[in-house]
């Protein structure tokens, strides 16, 4: 591998947990479904989940930088009516169980 290839931009995965106001699930569901796969430059959405417990929804996404990850959460998710808190976690794969 050349030095140029080894310095290529690495894509980081993130999990954004979303807490909403009581009785606001329907209002958040629609904007989540309307996001495109690339809601902003440098961010690619993978999956969205409804979860149980302290958090209500989770969005799994990739970003080419921490800055773009912060912009996506701050400029897109947090501005959705009913969102009261977010918690974004960068992820590092330790094992991919889908691969032998």
Model-derived regions: residue spans:
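A compositional/biophysical signature of low hydrophobicity enriched in polar/charged and small residues
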Residues: 1-100
């Amino acid at each position: 591998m050349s030095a140029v290839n080894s310095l290529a931009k690495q894509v980081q995965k993130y999990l954004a947990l979303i807490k909403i106001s009581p009785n606001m699930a329907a209002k958040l569901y629609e904007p989540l479904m309307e996001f495109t796969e690339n809601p902003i430059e440098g961010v690619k959405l993978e999956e969205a989940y409804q979860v149980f417990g302290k958090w209500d929804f989770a969005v799994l996404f990739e970003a080419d930088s921490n800055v773009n990850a912060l912009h996506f959460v701050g400029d897109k998710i947090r501005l959705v009516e009913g969102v009261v808190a977010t918690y974004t976690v960068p992820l590092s794969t330790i094992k991919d169980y889908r691969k032998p």
